[in-house]
Curated annotation (Swiss-Prot):
It comes from the Eukaryota. Keywords: Hydrolase, Membrane, Nucleus, Protein phosphatase, Transmembrane, Transmembrane helix. Coiled coil: none annotated. The gene is cnep-1. GO terms for cellular component: cytoplasm; endoplasmic reticulum membrane; Nem1-Spo7 phosphatase complex; nuclear envelope; nuclear membrane. Disruption phenotype: Excess of internal nuclear membranes in oocyte-derived pronuclei that are nearly or completely bisecting the nucleus in embryos during nuclear closure. Increased phosphatidylinositol (PI) production and ectopic ER sheets. Nuclei contain openings through which imported proteins passively diffuse. Increase in embryo nuclear size. Twinned nuclei after mitosis. Simultaneous knockdown of chmp-7 or lem-2 leads to enhanced nuclear sealing defects. This is CTD nuclear envelope phosphatase 1 homolog. Its EC number is 3.1.3.16. It is a single-pass membrane protein. It comes from Caenorhabditis elegans. The keyword DNA repair does not apply.
Length: 246
């Protein structure tokens, strides 16, 4: 009798674990692909249209790791990623003559975010990671749309105490029309008035940070100098989270 009870218990436990894993994968897929609409195509008034024509088209600089995506390589799983979490895509690159496979997780709604903001801004990728890695990730995020053509990598950064910094003036000398979206305050420490902080992302399927930024970015493009708005947000995110570069 005891053996039968143990068998039933093991079966139920296995079934429960299977159901739990299936539920996690299903809920993650639902959160990622749920229909989201930001009504950016609503016709603007003549006055608003004229205002937009009088200001320069802005540049939005985008970080990759922990801002738009999170990745880990060859089975090395960060503690923030739950075991068994499926990746959105994988890339294979050669680093120091060794082939390395990266499993890449996309931040929720990143594809929709890029499709919308590319209509408002010139998009530039600026990552402190190596070019061979950053190029592969940017290619996958671009999805053949040609919206992530301009790219800057580790060799364009400056190594300082605490990590890499990114020189926005190397992208465009007019700092009034450029802003950077980055999870690492150290990356934009020399350009705090051009920064749009965003919390680091690792695996939360319910994250909505990119969606939440759309109304703000929609409005920011109308200003003549982004620093007049971004300089008011001086409460940068604390540098307590580790930054991993590839």
């Amino acid at each position: 009798m005891t053996t039968i009870a143990q068998s039933v218990f093991c079966f139920l436990a296995g079934f429960f674990n299977f159901f739990l894993l299936y539920f996690r994968k299903t809920s993650r897929a639902y959160c990622k692909y749920q229909v989201v609409k930001y009504h950016s195509n609503i016709p603007m008034s003549p006055l608003t249209t004229h205002r937009l024509l009088t200001v320069k088209r802005k540049i939005l600089v985008l970080d990759l790791d922990e801002t738009l995506i999170h990745s880990h390589h060859d089975g090395v799983l960060r503690q923030t990623v739950k075991p068994g979490t499926p990746s959105d895509f994988t890339i294979r690159v050669v680093i120091d003559r060794h082939p390395v496979k990266f499993s890449v997780h996309e931040r929720p709604h990143v594809d929709y975010f890029l499709s919308v903001v590319s209509q408002w801004y010139e998009l530039v990728v600026f990552t402190a990671s190596m070019e061979v890695y950053g190029t592969s990730v940017a290619d996958r995020l671009d999805r053949g749309r040609g919206i992530l053509k301009r790219r800057y990598f580790r060799q364009h950064c400056t190594m300082e105490v605490g990590g890499y910094t990114k020189d926005l003036s190397a992208i465009h000398p007019d700092l009034s029309s450029i802003c950077i979206l980055d999870n690492s305050p150290g990356a934009y420490r020399k350009f705090p008035h051009n920064a749009i902080p965003i919390p680091s992302w690792f695996s939360d399927p319910n994250d909505t940070c990119l969606l939440n930024l759309l109304p703000f970015l929609d409005a920011l493009r109308f200003t003549s100098d982004v620093r007049s708005v971004l300089s008011r947000n001086m409460q940068a995110l604390p540098e307590t989270q580790s930054v991993q570069y590839y």
